[in-house]
Amino acid sequence: TINAQDTYNVNYDASSNGQLTYFACYADVTNQIINEGSTTYNLSNLDVNSDLINTPGFCNNRTNYAGWSLYVIYENSNLPLNQINLFQGLEIINSEVQEKTIILDNIDVLDNDNAKIGFLAWEGDNALNYGESLSINGNILSNPPLNLPDNAFNGTNTFTNSTNFYNADLDVYNIENNISIGDTQVTIKM
């Protein structure tokens, strides 16, 4: 059994659907992975059915799903050294909330050669009624044809080149020209 160590909530006033609270949780499962090793892992009992039944606004708002992800960060002395910063949280972007600025602090850029940034966004949509750009330090990111400059979270997956990653979006962008050695923060604007 794994319990959340951190929980992130976003309250959204969905007009006629009332206030909806979205959440994301985080747990460090490093020890479990080390103890179990290379094997098949199963996730079970992620049940949000009672939340959907008791709050019909989620279904009416077409945001009735749950998901999970596992980030694996490992060390291999045969590979080049990489600097990794992992940030977690939850924000909402939609037709009413079209812009967010996120400041990532406590970054110490040692090298920007081949630097990348990745995003996992839930509820990625290909067809939007407004633009959805993503910028790092004032520079709009894109990696066409998968991620155009005006639809960053479009239900795609950079790793598999999938264009039908329904209800999610997993993308990695090269940002070596958007950060500099010695930078201690990054400004993300969505």
Where are these regions (language model features)?
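A short beta-strand element within beta-rich, extracytoplasmic domains
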Residues: 1, 111-124
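Cysteine-clustered segments with highest specificity for TGF-beta superfamily mature ligands
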Residues: 2-61, 138-190
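A surface/extracellular/periplasmic glyco- and lipid-processing/surface-interacting theme
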Residues: 17-116
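Short, flexible beta-strand-to-coil junctions
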Residues: 47, 76, 121-127
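Short coil-to-beta strand junction motifs in C2/discoidin
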Residues: 63-66, 126-134
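Composition- and surface-driven signal marking solvent-exposed, interaction-prone regions
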Residues: 85-86, 129-135, 145-147
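Active-site lining segments that contact anionic ligands and/or coordinate catalytic metals
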Residues: 112-117, 131, 183-185
